[in-house]
Amino acid sequence: MTTVINRKYRISRRLGINLWGRAKDPVNRRKYPPGQRGILGFKRLSDFGKQFAAHKKFKFYYAISSKQLRRIFLDAYNRKGYTADNFIGILESRLSSVLYHSGLVPTIYSAKQLISHKHVTVNDKIVNIPSYRVKPGDIVKIRERAAKIPVIVEAVQKQERKAPDYLEADSKEYSVKYLRIPQYSEVPYSADMEVNLVVEFYSR
């Protein structure tokens, strides 16, 4: 887990933002890229560079590949309504996202790991696919044996992140209910994710 967290810190410094809002993130003190020449600062980005950087924010925040992110965008684009809202709605309906934003796990990576190891249920059925689409009304729960894992116990005890309004978390039952599909402004991002630039990036 320490290796994963250190990798996350490096990603934050590369992007120049505290992507996950962790208090100990080195980017809070060193606002320049990692590496020997990082202290020289960030280069001024072109319009494409800004769009590409915004796309990377979402890729790293949700711990998914560029290919997956593009597929999600195309799905959002082909739906009725605003593409940006559709895009966020799909990302936030992923099982790993619901579990992470519940505050019952410390990181998006730990959420994905728990799911992959069959420690999570949706409506009392085991689901081991992090990208599984949760529907409004579904109840996601960490199985009893996994609730004793130290990082889970610590996350629940600390309650560093409060579940957003579209989720109803129950720390005693290690469960979270997905109430509704959120809009961009409701998601508790720690940084400006610039979703409009992502739409521009994929619309080129």
UniProtKB/Swiss-Prot annotation:
Subunit structure comment from the entry: Part of the 30S ribosomal subunit. Contacts protein S5. The interaction surface between S4 and S5 is involved in control of translational fidelity.
NCBIfam families: PRK05327.1 (NF003717), rpsD_bact (TIGR01017)
Record's keyword annotation contains Transcription: no
Protein's name in the database: Small ribosomal subunit protein uS4
GO terms for cellular component: small ribosomal subunit
Ribonucleoprotein among keywords: yes
Gene Ontology terms, MF aspect: rRNA binding; structural constituent of ribosome
SMART domains in alphabetical order: Ribosomal_S4, S4
Stored SUPFAM superfamilies: Alpha-L RNA-binding motif (SSF55174)
Cited InterPro entries: Ribosomal_uS4, Ribosomal_uS4_bac-type, Ribosomal_uS4_N, S4_RNA-bd, S4_RNA-bd_sf
Database matches in Gene3D superfamilies: Ribosomal Protein S4 Delta 41, Chain A, domain 1, RNA-binding S4 domain
Alphabetized UniProt keyword annotations: Ribonucleoprotein, Ribosomal protein, RNA-binding, rRNA-binding
Domain of life: Bacteria
Domain S4 RNA-binding: 93-156
Species name: Wolbachia sp. subsp. Brugia malayi (strain TRS)
Job of this protein: One of the primary rRNA binding proteins, it binds directly to 16S rRNA where it nucleates assembly of the body of the 30S subunit. With S5 and S12 plays an important role in translational accuracy.
